[in-house]
């Protein structure tokens, strides 16, 4: 295969959105799969809305996802600069060439005149387009209009007849009639190029071979192909990937949930899980497997398995995939992810002392199997902080009225006060001793202890839970629960 050069060119007007992240990922994977180059540049010609802060946020999000690039912003390269506002001279040169060859012209129409044209087309039931009023202005006409203070835009002269055909690598053959396009603006009155013009110049000068982007850009492609042809440039191959829809099959938006990568990062999703999920929004591996490492994806990705049909953003599936990765994640990493949420909840503060660090560590270990993303750890705070017990149901409270409960809780309290270090392994051994001493097994031992400690019949890992609560916390919980349930444990003192 030819040397593949692909790019991702975000506009720095806000955070990196899910759709943009998927486009970046597909480009990255194609380049890595076939030994090509992945370029990241910035389309910052929206001067009012663009900011370096947004640029940094987007680049940081790409790096967090593990999407690296070979050339472009932050890394440099032979086609620098990689911001459009630093490349304005190249667009001016191309526009001047088109003007000189009669393939573009200056248009002096006011916004009011253009709006009247749009309304006229709408009344006839036609798509709005430019009428061509300024197509054949004489030099005297232009001088007069400039004297009136009008600042021209530059429009591309679209052929009156014919069609522009695209052989899209995802959508197949698509054709657009030139008559429906109309002469479009390539340079605004302030000298800033429009998207359709600048992107062609950039892609051509950076030798881009494949453009992989969202389906919403398909309608831009005929305009871009006309510019390629007018400048005598070879266009890249195009692949327009499907839209991302919400579960109600409308276009993904904030009402469906978080739409930016940073929002998922802040909620404690793992980047490798989000990458795994994003690639499945439109790409099929061809089998039943759904969990892929980045290396797996690089080895398998190809455009021929990218679907035409829209992809549905399924939060339940994302949570399932992230849960799979959380189960395998290093505990220290999860503790770091949990800390901002615990700090915000006000139950810990940095720097942690030894006792607090131990508590948080074992809390995270206890809930690792129970959460889909780390922000959910706050739901478990009542189980780990404070001595208060609230029974989740009458059924849970009734567990403590079972015949064997007093001897089980007494034995548990004895073991807790023996002085051995509390670790998950030691707690596991301790609970085995309780079953042996009481001659009770399974549910008859573990359920009353769990209910006494948490007020719940189901919950996080019991060994890590007791370790996180600590000796005093666990003893106080058991005593308090027994008191609330009317369970007599006797008057034996249990020192901590």
Swiss-Prot record:
* UniProtKB keywords: Aminoacyl-tRNA synthetase, ATP-binding, Cytoplasm, Ligase, Nucleotide-binding, Protein biosynthesis
Q: Which residues cross the membrane?
A: none
Tell whether Cytoplasm is among the UniProt keywords: yes
Q: Which domain of life is it from?
A: Bacteria
Q: Where does ATP bind?
A: 254
Task: Name the Enzyme Commission number(s) assigned to this protein.
Answer: 6.1.1.17
Entry-linked Gene3D superfamilies:
1.10.10.350, HUPs
Q: Per the record's keyword annotation, is tRNA processing included, yes or no?
A: no
A Gene Ontology molecular function term for this protein is: zinc ion binding
Instruction: Please tell me which stretches of this chain the record labels as motif 'KMSKS' region.
Output: 251-255
Q: Please name the top-level EC class of this enzyme.
A: ligase
Residue span of motif 'HIGH' region:
10-20
Cellular component GO terms held in the UniProt record: cytosol
Q: Give the record's subunit note.
A: Monomer.
The protein's matches in NCBIfam families, at most eight in alphabetical order, are given as: gltX_bact
Function as written in the Swiss-Prot or TrEMBL entry: Catalyzes the attachment of glutamate to tRNA(Glu) in a two-step reaction: glutamate is first activated by ATP to form Glu-AMP and then transferred to the acceptor end of tRNA(Glu).
Protein name (Swiss-Prot/TrEMBL): Glutamate--tRNA ligase
């Amino acid at each position: 295969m030819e040397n593949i050069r692909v790019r991702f060119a975000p506009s720095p007007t806000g955070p990196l959105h899910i759709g943009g992240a998927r486009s970046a990922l597909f480009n990255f994977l194609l380049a890595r799969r076939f030994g090509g180059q992945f370029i990241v540049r910035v389309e910052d010609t929206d001067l009012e809305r663009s900011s370096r802060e947004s640029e940094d946020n987007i680049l940081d999000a790409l790096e967090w996802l593990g999407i690296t690039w070979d050339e472009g912003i932050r890394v440099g390269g032979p086609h620098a600069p990689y911001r459009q506002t630093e490349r304005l001279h190249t667009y001016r040169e191309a526009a001047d060439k088109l003007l000189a060859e009669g393939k573009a012209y200056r248009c002096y129409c006011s916004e009011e005149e253009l709006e009247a044209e749009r309304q006229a087309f709408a009344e006839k039931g036609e798509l709005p387009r430019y009428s061509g009023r300024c197509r054949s202005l004489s030099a005297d006409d232009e001088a007069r209009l400039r004297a009136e203070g009008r600042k021209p835009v530059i429009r591309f002269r679209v052929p009156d007849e014919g069609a522009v055909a695209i052989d899209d690598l995802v959508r197949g053959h698509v054709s657009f009639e030139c008559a429906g396009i109309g002469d479009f603006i390539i340079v605004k009155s302030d000298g800033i190029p429009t998207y359709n013009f600048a992107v062609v110049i950039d892609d051509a000068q950076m030798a881009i071979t494949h453009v992989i982007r969202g389906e919403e850009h398909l309608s831009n492609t005929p305009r871009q192909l006309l510019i390629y042809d007018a400048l005598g440039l070879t266009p890249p191959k195009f692949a327009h990937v499907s839209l991302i829809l919400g579960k109600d099959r409308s276009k993904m938006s904030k009402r469906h949930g978080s739409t930016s990568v940073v929002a998922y990062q802040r909620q404690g999703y793992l980047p490798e899980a989000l990458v795994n999920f994003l690639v499945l929004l439109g790409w099929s591996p061809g089998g039943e497997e759904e969990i892929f490492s980045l290396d797996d994806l690089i080895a398998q990705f190809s455009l021929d398995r990218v679907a035409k049909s829209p992809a549905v953003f399924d939060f339940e599936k994302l949570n399932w995939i992230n849960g799979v990765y959380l189960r395998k994640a290093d505990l220290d990493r999860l503790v770091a992810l949990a800390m901002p949420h615990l700090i915000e909840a006000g139950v810990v503060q940095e720097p942690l002392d030894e006792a607090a660090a131990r508590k948080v560590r074992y809390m995270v270990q206890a809930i690792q199997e129970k959460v889909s993303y780390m922000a959910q750890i706050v739901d478990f705070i009542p189980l780990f902080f404070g001595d208060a017990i609230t029974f989740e149901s009458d059924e849970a409270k009734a567990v403590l009225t079972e015949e064997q409960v007093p001897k089980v809780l007494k034995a548990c309290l004895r073991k807790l006060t023996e002085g051995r270090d509390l670790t998950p392994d030691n707690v596991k051994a301790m609970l085995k001793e309780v079953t042996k001493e009481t001659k009770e097994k399974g549910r008859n031992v573990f359920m009353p202890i769990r209910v006494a400690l948490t007020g719940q019949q189901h919950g996080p890992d019991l060994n890590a839970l007791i370790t996180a609560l600590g000796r005093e916390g666990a003893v106080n919980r058991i005593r308090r629960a027994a008191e609330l349930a009317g369970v007599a444990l006797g008057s034996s003192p249990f020192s901590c």
